Regions:
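Extended interfacial segments that mediate partner engagement and assembly in macromolecular machines
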Residues: 8-12, 20-121, 126-130, 141-142
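C-terminal lobe
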Residues: 130-143, 172
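Short, structured patches in soluble enzyme cores that scaffold and shape functional sites
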Residues: 123-126, 135-137, 169, 211
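General N-terminal leader/first-domain-start detector
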Residues: 1-15
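Rossmann-like S-adenosyl-L-methionine
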Residues: 3, 143-145, 150-386
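Ser/Thr- (and often Asn-) enriched beta-sheet segments in non-cytosolic proteins
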Residues: 83, 118, 134, 197-201, ...
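Solvent-exposed residues in well-ordered beta-strands and their adjoining turns
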Residues: 74-78, 136-138, 384-386
Length: 386
């Protein structure tokens, strides 16, 4: 069974035929009702797929609506007709919608026609306190640069706390809002004004990450995510902590204080550079390396476990899951505890079967509602050796 089918099975009749755009199937519901649907759906998914250890109740999102810190609009310009091919969403902050309306009103004027024709996407990223705007363009010449600088001045003066604006050149005109993959260099990335990095304030420290890098879309749930991961992974003094798909080091820095050593791995070069800079600034003896996490990488690039010294592994792969052979090679390291984080629920059955096959059993399953209004969950699964 797929998780979206379980969601559909538990939806009230009046929302089953709802015309919710872009997968926001549950957005019309009151949040209390949405949680009831999701809790019933994850239990049904678990039962039908005969998975071990039923899930705990879902941890609710502190902000169930207007929570998204990243949003985007695809720009389509035809003679006499400018369109943003996405619509305002109640899952996005009102400030995002206001910025898009401001930009639309500028781009529709004759003076900004060259820029309107050049645009692929407009992206807004940031936090609940400030925003950064990225203009993804298919070409860049002197006239377009002038218009970008003019529109950047408008953003600086607007009341929506737009602290930076940048241009990203994507000549492929791809359907991805940055490009088919996130950029690993800065050749096509141009600064209009403001810092080139974003930051996440975690209270006792602040982490920087690249404006093109991956970050959690629901800032309001990050505290619950870290708290839950800390409890489930259970790092102790003397443990070696291996943080795979670490991004800019969120879990490495939030959980790694108790560990004897921390090694973070991420394929995205700019994010790893930010993690290294944070380690230097915080004077932490952490190590970060860049590389594609596949079977060969785990076998050949990761340092071998130290006999007699426990290792705990956290892996937070993309929605498609891990590459073939990764779980097997990680299990051969014999970590005392694994925390596997899933943002794609449908990947869970196959992954848990593989962990089981190589000597690990489920200890606890904890879903978080990281994506309110949509038929998706972030699920934390703690595993231990049999």
């Amino acid at each position: 069974m797929f998780f979206e089918q379980a969601i559909a099975n538990n939806l009230p009749n009046y929302t089953k035929e709802s015309d919710s755009a872009y997968g926001e199937t549950l957005a019309p519901l009151e949040y209390k009702e949405e949680l009831k649907v999701k809790n019933a759906a994850i239990r049904e998914f678990w039962d039908v797929n005969r998975l071990a250890r039923g899930p705990q109740p879902i941890i609710a999102s502190p902000m169930p609506r207007n929570y998204r810190t990243t949003s985007k609009r695809q720009v389509e310009m035809k003679p006499g007709d400018l369109r943003f091919n996405e619509y305002d969403s109640i899952l996005e902050p009102e400030e995002h919608n206001a910025i898009y309306r401001l930009l639309f009103d500028k781009l529709i004027t004759p003076a900004y026609k060259p820029l309107a024709y050049a645009l692929n996407w407009i992206i807004i990223r940031g936090t609940y306190k400030y925003r950064v705007v990225i203009f993804n363009v298919k070409k860049l010449d002197a006239s377009i640069v002038r218009k970008l600088k003019q529109i950047a001045e408008v953003l600086q003066q607007c009341p929506y706390h737009v602290t930076a604006a940048h241009t990203y050149v994507d000549t492929t005109e791809s359907n991805y809002y940055l490009e088919a993959k996130r950029p690993t260099d800065t050749l096509n990335f141009k600064q209009l004004y403001g810092p080139r990095e974003l930051s996440l304030d975690l209270g006792h420290f602040r982490l920087k990450y690249p404006v093109t890098g991956f970050s959690q879309i629901n800032e309001s749930q990050i505290h619950n995510l870290i708290k839950s991961a800390s409890r489930l992974l259970g790092l102790e003094k003397g443990d070696h902590f291996l943080d795979l798909y670490c991004g800019y080091g969120l879990f490495s820095f939030a959980l790694g204080e108790a560990a004897k050593s921390v090694l973070g791995v991420e394929w995205e070069g700019p994010s790893i550079d930010c993690a290294k800079a944070s380690a230097r600034f915080l004077k932490k003896n952490y190590k970060f390396i860049a590389g594609k996490i596949d079977e060969t990488f785990v076998q050949m690039r990761l340092p071998r476990p130290i006999p007699g010294e426990p290792e705990r592994i956290l892996l937070d792969p993309p929605r498609k899951g891990t590459e073939p052979g990764v779980i097997r090679t990680l299990a051969l390291r014999k970590p005392v505890r694994v925390l596997h984080i899933f943002c794609g629920t449908d990947e869970i059955p196959d992954a848990l079967a593989e962990w089981e096959r190589f000597g690990y059993r489920v200890k606890e399953v904890l879903p978080l509602d990281l994506f309110p209004g949509t038929p998706h969950l972030e699920t934390l699964v703690a595993l231990e050796r049999k």
